[in-house]
């Protein structure tokens, strides 16, 4: 067993594999992408549109100006991240560009640095702060541009397939080349609508003679094959056929006839070169349509005429206009852009076809073309592209296995944050070009040009702000705990702009594909409608320069491990035989077994050890970070592992975090890269530590303390966060884990964040569990817990909620924040300061009696003049403004909330600037609430084993061990077999061994502890502590005899007991429970609102009405539909009657009936209501 040190903790690892590369920077994908955008991307976009010119020719001279962008830099951020969060600002920095303006006529130049405006930038934690809120831009998985060979689905049963070569650009009109095997013809489909004969398209590529085009698509006929010859009668021959004596038998371009076949046989000619059958039939169909004889060439003019007639019907044909229109469609980079990625993919795909073309058409030597790559540079299509694609398409009939799989990762690329923001910037900037040109054209002299006034990118700033605020890929950050944050930054989504639609995504798109191995996690994905569309990056996966996912492998040469690591994309991997890293190696790195299972293409095959090319880098390579935190993952069903992965992200940080006894070794990396653990920036010695600050004196390479020239110590100061609210209202608090005098290394943790313990992720607690049914209290996944967990605050968490109120300008005067509130006793304002704002440290929300809720911010709103009585007017004239009537509109603590005020922020319009329309003052109050474990709270393990607390039992009534220790949690044993998550059983036993031996274990995924490593060792330790009763020494099971805490009697059978890591999830009962007596009503139908947020009521729907009807409970039903709902007059009368202890009045007419009548009147129907005597009733008065 290996050991490794993490800070002050030693972990014992069961892992057998030595990993030669460390876990990479887990948020590199976000950081690198944004850095690339700032360092190169923005300048590349600015230069793409340079020069912007206003030059025009006057007489013989060119006049005007050229404007070009020479350089670009980013200034310092305007505010700190903390300030932006407090003041609800966006974290921005100014962008500057060096602009050069050139006078075209004189060549004179002027250069000046101008501001492009303030733009949102990434924080050190790879997030964006937009209007005070942290957001993450998620990476998007989209189809890569390029060319795809696919089979088009046909609706006709029994029909032959239609093969497509599909050119997919980043921008421009789609072009598809179709091979229809039913009518044996080739077509070009333009923009998924218009279909043309393919020969017309080929004619526009610059070929004069038809035979030259046909020669590009040859086929070879065997003269002895009667069937093929009969099928090919009438086909065009593509070469001059000469007999052995030198006599010309047939000229190039002649037609194959039965007579010619006989002559060929007589002369002993075995093979002849003819036109491909499908190309010939395509050509003949066009000839028939155009009613032209075979020997006559189709002119380029005629081809353009036919194409134009199809694409622009009804328009007058002009040759130059038609040629320009067609060339702009596919051969102009401004209209049709493949992009650098699309060109790279296309060149890669067409390389073999190009080599074949060089041999067949240009007659090159096969050996000379072996190393030639297809290296076309244009970002638009070229004639040779189209020819090579057609040649490949013609081969798909014989080799359908060469067709592309849409769901293969080689056909998908990742658009990272930098690219998404860059394309938004480019789109907005392209709209500003015309405006700059127009301004530039107004100037006549270089000296008079004001460069800053030329560059006004207000629309670009607005567009980027809109992107961050509204784009589905810019998301409100999941910040429940550090792993939730880390996972959000590593998320891949296939939905969003330019991606898939959730409703239309096929099962195949969502499914796990073999190319995902080591790139995308096959386990971590949501359970709902997004399943398979939103995924997570695997641990070691990264992105190459073109946006394709790559994963590392280690080379194997002649069955021996090499130290070389290679990163492969999904298509490159297909050519190699790759073994798992868990196969057996000797000490020198040689593979021990003769035959090894390897991944090759889509299959797993057995090969000789010398045939193995590569080996995985790590057993956890296949899964994501969250999934790699599940111990014994290999023993869990995939569906439960999925739930375990997702629930770890919902774990609430508890007051005293505790690292798991049974980890996987990934806890350290997950915590470090989450951004919540404070890391030392340099080597040093700790000089000062308190709850808010750590000061470290730097040391040099020799271990000597460093001082500046004046003799002052060079120090690093770290400020810790205390009770900061996260996006999900959990508390972010950092606490030091170093002492004065400690030596710290660069990069080592010096302070823990939320849910971390000594630099390791700590999402839950190690608790003593027993798998035992107990009086039905753990029926159906319910959980029985001990009162001990409450006494020790095991699952108590702190949540910070923010409440805000604004003082606005109203029509009758401004609202005022004050402690002088009408009709409020001194008792209720005892915690308010002189300004009417609650003092920090006050405990609010604890209600002893049915009194009004505590006031957080006292606020009064002036009443309108119109509703002032004559008496009030006299009072006002006597006392002036002091007598002015106001109504209480204070901010109060909501129902069911209690906690301590930990912060108050007041913003005044004069100091901050704009707070919103009509707002003078904004007050935010932060309330910290302590939430201990309660009945109804959701608990979960790491194996998808979740449940709700059903009862909190006194610890003396809990089942107890032979030494008297009561268990803390009782789980149902029926939750294990059907769920097939046996990992929890192994974790429980290993957890007990860890506790008894005072050790922490690591059991890496797919390389962890076996049952035989745990149970015999556990039995030995239990025997020394006299805890072995109920277990078999020859075949230990980890079970023990338990006694009932209430009776002291033994249970009938031994019970599995041990320590399991359990988390409390964000689904807290206290936040969901809700009750209403009287509350707000909907304005139109006057029924109570719904939901806790609106302090709403319970909906009594039509099915509930049927239930009361079925029981004949007429009075109850009458009440439900009237006075308890929308009978306005009736419910007021009932309230009065209850308060005065009188009999309840008769119900009146519900508002919903009036609404129905009004709706019918809106349909121009005259609806009248009559009583039993036939008198008309005015329902508006009822």
From Swiss-Prot:
Protein keywords: DNA-directed RNA polymerase, Nucleotidyltransferase, Transcription, Transferase
Tree of life domain: Bacteria
Known role: DNA-dependent RNA polymerase catalyzes the transcription of DNA into RNA using the four ribonucleoside triphosphates as substrates.
Gene: rpoB
Protein name: DNA-directed RNA polymerase subunit beta
GO CC terms of this entry: DNA-directed RNA polymerase complex
Organism: Fervidobacterium nodosum (strain ATCC 35602 / DSM 5306 / Rt17-B1)
GO biological process: DNA-templated transcription
Molecular function GO labels: DNA binding; DNA-directed RNA polymerase activity; ribonucleoside binding
Nucleotidyltransferase recorded as keyword: yes
Pfam families: RNA_pol_Rpb2_1, RNA_pol_Rpb2_3, RNA_pol_Rpb2_45, RNA_pol_Rpb2_6, RNA_pol_Rpb2_7
NCBIfam families: PRK00405.1, rpoB
Family in the record: Belongs to the RNA polymerase beta chain family.
């Amino acid at each position: 067993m290996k050991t490794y040190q993490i800070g002050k903790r030693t972990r014992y690892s069961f892992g057998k594999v030595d990993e030669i590369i460390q876990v990479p920077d887990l948020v590199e994908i976000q950081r690198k992408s944004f850095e690339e955008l700032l360092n190169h991307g923005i300048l590349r976009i600015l230069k793409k549109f340079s020069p912007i010119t206003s030059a025009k020719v006057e007489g013989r001279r060119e006049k005007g100006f050229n404007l070009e962008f020479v350089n670009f830099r980013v200034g310092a951020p305007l505010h700190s991240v903390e300030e932006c969060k407090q003041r609800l600002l966006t974290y921005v920095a100014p962008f500057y560009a060096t602009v050069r303006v050139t006078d075209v006529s004189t060549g004179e130049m002027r250069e000046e640095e101008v501001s492009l405006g303030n733009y949102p930038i990434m924080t050190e934690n790879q997030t964006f702060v937009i209007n005070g809120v942290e957001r993450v831009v998620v990476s998007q998985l989209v189809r890569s541009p390029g060319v795809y060979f696919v089979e088009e689905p046909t609706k006709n049963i029994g029909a032959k397939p239609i093969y497509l070569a599909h050119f997919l650009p980043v921008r421009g009109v789609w072009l598809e080349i179709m091979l229809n095997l039913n009518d044996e013809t080739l077509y070009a489909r333009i923009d998924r609508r218009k279909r043309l004969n393919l020969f017309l398209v080929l004619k526009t590529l610059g070929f004069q003679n038809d035979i030259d085009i046909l020669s590009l698509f040859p086929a070879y006929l065997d003269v002895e094959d009667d069937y093929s010859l009969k099928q090919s009668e009438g086909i065009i021959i593509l070469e001059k056929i000469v007999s052995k004596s030198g006599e010309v038998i047939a000229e190039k371009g002649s037609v194959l006839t039965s007579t010619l076949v006989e002559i060929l046989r007589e002369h002993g000619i075995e093979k002849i070169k003819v036109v491909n059958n499908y190309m010939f039939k395509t050509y003949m169909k066009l000839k028939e349509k155009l009613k032209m004889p075979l020997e006559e060439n189709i002119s380029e003019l005629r081809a353009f005429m036919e194409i134009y007639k199809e694409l622009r019907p009804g328009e007058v044909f002009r040759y130059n206009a038609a040629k320009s229109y067609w060339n702009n469609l596919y051969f102009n980079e401004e209209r049709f852009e493949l992009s650098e990625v699309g060109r790279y993919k296309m060149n890669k795909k067409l390389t073999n076809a190009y080599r074949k073309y060089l041999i067949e058409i240009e007659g090159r030597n096969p050996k000379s073309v072996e190393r030639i790559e297809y290296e076309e540079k244009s970002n638009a299509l070229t004639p040779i592209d189209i020819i090579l694609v057609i040649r490949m398409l013609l081969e798909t009939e014989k080799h359908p296995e060469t067709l592309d799989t849409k769901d293969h990762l080689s056909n998908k690329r990742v658009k990272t944050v930098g690219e998404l923001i860059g394309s938004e910037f480019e789109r907005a900037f392209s709209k500003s070009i015309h405006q700059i040109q127009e301004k530039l054209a107004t100037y006549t002299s270089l000296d008079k040009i004001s460069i800053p006034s030329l560059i006004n990118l207000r629309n670009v700033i607005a567009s980027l702000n809109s992107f961050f605020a509204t784009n589905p890929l810019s998301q409100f950050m999941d910040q429940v705990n550090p792993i939730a944050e880390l996972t959000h930054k590593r998320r891949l989504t296939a939905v969003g702009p330019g991606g898939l639609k959730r409703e239309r995504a096929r099962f195949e798109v969502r499914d796990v594909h073999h190319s995902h191995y080591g790139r995308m996690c096959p386990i971590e994905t949501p359970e709902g409608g997004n399943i398979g569309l939103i995924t997570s990056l695997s641990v070691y996966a990264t992105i190459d320069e073109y946006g394709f996912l790559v994963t590392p492998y280690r080379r194997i040469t002649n069955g021996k491990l090499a130290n070389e690591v290679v990163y492969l994309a999904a298509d490159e991997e297909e050519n190699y035989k790759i073994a798992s890293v868990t196969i057996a190696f000797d000490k020198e790195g040689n593979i021990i077994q003769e035959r090894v299972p390897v991944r090759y293409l889509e299959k797993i095959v057995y090969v000789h050890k010398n045939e193995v090319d590569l080996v995985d880098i790590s057993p956890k390579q296949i899964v994501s970070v969250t999934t790699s935190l599940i111990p014994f993952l290999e023993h869990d069903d995939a569906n439960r592992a999925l739930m375990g992965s997702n629930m770890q992200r919902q774990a609430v940080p508890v007051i005293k975090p505790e690292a798991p006894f049974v980890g996987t070794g990934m806890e350290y990396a997950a915590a470090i890269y989450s951004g919540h653990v404070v890391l030392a920036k340099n080597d040093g010695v700790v000089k000062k530590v308190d709850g808010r600050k750590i000061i470290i004196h730097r040391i040099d390479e020799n271990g000597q303390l460093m001082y500046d020239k004046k003799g002052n110590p060079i120090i690093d100061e770290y400020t810790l966060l205390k009770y900061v609210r996260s996006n999900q209202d959990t508390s972010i608090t950092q606490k030091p884990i170093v002492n004065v005098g400690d030596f710290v290394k660069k990069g080592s943790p010096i302070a823990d964040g939320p849910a971390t313990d000594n630099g390791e992720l700590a999402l839950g607690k190690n608790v003593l569990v027993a798998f035992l049914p107990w009086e039905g209290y753990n029926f159906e996944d319910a959980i029985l817990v001990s009162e001990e967990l409450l006494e020790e605050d095991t699952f108590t968490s702190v949540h910070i909620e923010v409440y805000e109120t604004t003082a606005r300008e109203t029509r009758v005067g401004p609202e005022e924040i004050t402690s002088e509130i009408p009709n409020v006793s001194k008792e209720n304002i005892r915690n308010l300061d002189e300004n009417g704002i609650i003092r920090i440290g006050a405990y609010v929300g604890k209600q002893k009696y049915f009194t009004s809720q505590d006031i957080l911010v006292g606020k009064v709103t002036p009443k309108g003049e119109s509703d002032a009585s004559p008496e009030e007017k006299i009072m006002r004239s006597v006392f002036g403004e002091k007598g002015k009537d106001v109504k209480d509109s204070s901010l109060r603590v909501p129902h069911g909330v209690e906690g301590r005020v930990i912060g108050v922020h007041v913003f005044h319009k004069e100091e901050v600037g704009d707070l919103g329309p009509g707002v003078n003052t904004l007050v935010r109050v932060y309330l910290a609430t302590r939430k201990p474990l309660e009945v109804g709270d959701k608990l979960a393990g790491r194996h998808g084993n979740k449940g709700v607390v059903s009862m909190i039992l006194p610890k003396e009534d809990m089942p107890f061990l032979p030494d008297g220790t009561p268990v803390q949690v009782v789980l149902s044993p029926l939750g294990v077999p059907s769920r097939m998550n046996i990992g929890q059983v192994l974790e429980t036993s290993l957890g007990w061994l860890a506790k008894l031996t005072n050790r922490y274990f690591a059991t890496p995924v797919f390389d962890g502890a076996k049952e035989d490593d745990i149970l015999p060792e556990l039995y030995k330790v239990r025997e020394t502590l006299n805890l072995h009763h109920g277990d078999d020494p020859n075949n230990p099971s980890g079970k023990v005899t338990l006694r009932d805490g209430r009776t002291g009697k033994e249970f009938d059978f031994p019970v599995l007991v041990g320590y399991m890591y359990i988390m409390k999830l964000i689904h807290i009962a206290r936040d969901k429970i809700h009750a209403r007596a009287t509350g707000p009503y909907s304005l139109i139908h006057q029924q109570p609102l719904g939901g806790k947020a609106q302090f709403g009521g319970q909906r009594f729907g039509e099915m509930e009405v049927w239930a009361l009807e079925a029981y004949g409970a007429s009075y109850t039903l009458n009440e439900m539909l009237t006075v308890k709902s929308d009978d306005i007059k009736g419910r007021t009368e009932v309230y009065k009657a209850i308060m005065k202890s009188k009999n309840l009045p008769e119900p009146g007419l519900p508002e919903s009936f009036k609404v129905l009548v009004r709706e019918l009147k809106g349909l121009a129907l005259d609806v009248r209501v009559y009583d039993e005597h036939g008198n008309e009733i005015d329902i508006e008065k009822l």
